[in-house]
């Protein structure tokens, strides 16, 4: 699900999917990754071709890159065929969690083949003032 590497100055994190990971193993992986990259000059987070998964997994990851609590996004879910058949609006927040956060510059790599929880990840990380995104076309 998560792969990372680091040069002297920069970290690179590849998020393959946001589904099927246990919270304990995700927390341990994030502790290791953020601990290793926390003094980097910048980090590239790559979610290209991510099939998605749980919004809560996306938020858990982004929380390790937050400097303070912020609104991530609002969501309604379609629940039926009618034009107005949606759940009530739910507000999702991002906020610092874990032993360490990385709050330096972040570049998000995404493309037109990112879905579901991957889209939520992209929406939420855009709320961080130290993050910006690059959308790449698939060939």
Give the ranges of each region predicted by the language model.
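Short beta-strand/loop segment at the start of cytosolic alpha/beta domains
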Residues: 1-24
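A mature extracytoplasmic/lumenal domain signature
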Residues: 17-19, 49-51, 112, 137-138
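Short acidic catalytic loops
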Residues: 13-14, 36-52, 109
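A short, well-ordered alpha-helical element
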Residues: 21-41
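Loop/turn elements at helix/coil->beta-strand transitions in domains of secreted/extracellular proteins
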Residues: 8-10, 39-43, 68-70, 103-105, ...
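Gly/Ser/Thr-rich loop/hinge elements
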Residues: 52-109, 113
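Extracytoplasmic/secreted envelope proteins and their assembly/folding machinery
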Residues: 27-34, 58-62, 103-106, 118-122, ...
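Terminal peptide-recognition signature
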Residues: 13, 45, 65, 106, ...
């Amino acid at each position: 699900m998560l792969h990372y590497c680091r040069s002297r100055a920069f970290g690179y994190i590849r998020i393959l999917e946001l589904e099927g990971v246990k919270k304990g193993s995700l927390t341990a992986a994030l502790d290791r990754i953020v601990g290793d990259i926390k003094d980097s000059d910048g980090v590239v987070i790559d979610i290209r071709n991510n099939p998605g998964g749980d919004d809560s997994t996306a938020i858990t990851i982004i929380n390790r890159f937050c400097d303070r609590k912020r609104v991530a996004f609002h969501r309604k879910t379609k629940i039926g065929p009618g034009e107005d058949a949606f759940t009530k609006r739910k507000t999702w927040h991002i906020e610092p969690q874990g032993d360490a956060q990385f709050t330096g510059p972040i570049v998000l790599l995404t493309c037109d083949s990112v879905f579901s929880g991957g889209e939520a990840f992209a929406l939420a990380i855009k709320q961080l003032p130290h993050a910006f995104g690059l959308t790449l076309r698939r060939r």
